[in-house]
Amino acid sequence: MSDQKTAELNKMIEEISQKLNMLNIGVIKAEDFSNEKLEDLEYLHQMVMKKKSFSPSEMQAIAEELAALRK
């Protein structure tokens, strides 16, 4: 994965973390995602950034999806 792509992924992960007020997201890094999962992560990022707020169950589902997308 290129340095630019890694930086973009780290930015998306950080934005998701901030939007959801997730404290332990720091354990997830761009290197944790395979190239096959990048499109899914980008879709998840777009969905999170469009919503203004999340229910606790939605936040849990997003965290589970992030975990599932890891290598």
Curated annotation (Swiss-Prot):
Domain of life: Bacteria
Database matches in InterPro entries: UPF0435
Family statement drawn from the similarity comment of this UniProt entry: Belongs to the UPF0435 family.
Protein's name in the database: UPF0435 protein BLi00816/BL03111
Organism encoding this protein: Bacillus licheniformis (strain ATCC 14580 / DSM 13 / JCM 2505 / CCUG 7422 / NBRC 12200 / NCIMB 9375 / NCTC 10341 / NRRL NRS-1264 / Gibson 46)
